């Protein structure tokens, strides 16, 4: 089946109120008239209000529809959980695509596969779209454990929620050794892992596997995106540094739209 690509910008710990408004205005200009690719951005949670307002203005002025996302969520809806953000709070700002399982969260905040699966469940229950990040470290890659690691991270969801939980969800394969390093998996390497991920889900439910969006992340930029998107199982990208520059991000979006339509 034809899958509509999704390119999402993960701004990480970057930006300001002024930066958020300016970048969205620039994206509106750069992406004018681009069809065939869904686009989302995940600014820091402090700037969701500015982003929501700027995106509403963009749509009302006939600009490209850009969805709002977030970089994290907690499993609790409310209560004594200092510093956490709930699904309902994110919905209140119009956020749709929520990143979970990013290697920076797994590493710096010691988030386990099991905890990430609980976040996945919370997002599905709230009607939001999980963007589940998976991927291996450089040591695991060199030891030939890429598929083993990816399978384990996916199984945390599969074995608790079932394959149907991936209906309407997004997976982002981000090899840790390629994130922010300037290194990137070759298109063939990335395709092999994406095909494995889809095949792993297909063992449980082929129909779900065929429709799930699998993005590539890990030093995706305006120079390598087009070649990555020629691969049949790469359905877009989760973009880090390049998403902070409207022209570079727009090149990636346009490359996805061209390759998949």
Swiss-Prot record:
GO molecular function term, any single one: triose-phosphate isomerase activity
Compartmental location: Cytoplasm
UniProt binding sites for substrate: 10-12, 180, 219, 240-241
Matches recorded under InterPro entries: Aldolase_TIM, TIM_sf, TrioseP_Isoase_bac/euk, Triosephosphate_isomerase, Triosephosphate_isomerase_AS
Chief localization: cytoplasm
Function: Involved in the gluconeogenesis. Catalyzes stereospecifically the conversion of dihydroxyacetone phosphate (DHAP) to D-glyceraldehyde-3-phosphate (G3P).
Family: Belongs to the triosephosphate isomerase family.
Name used for this protein in its record: Triosephosphate isomerase
Gene: tpiA
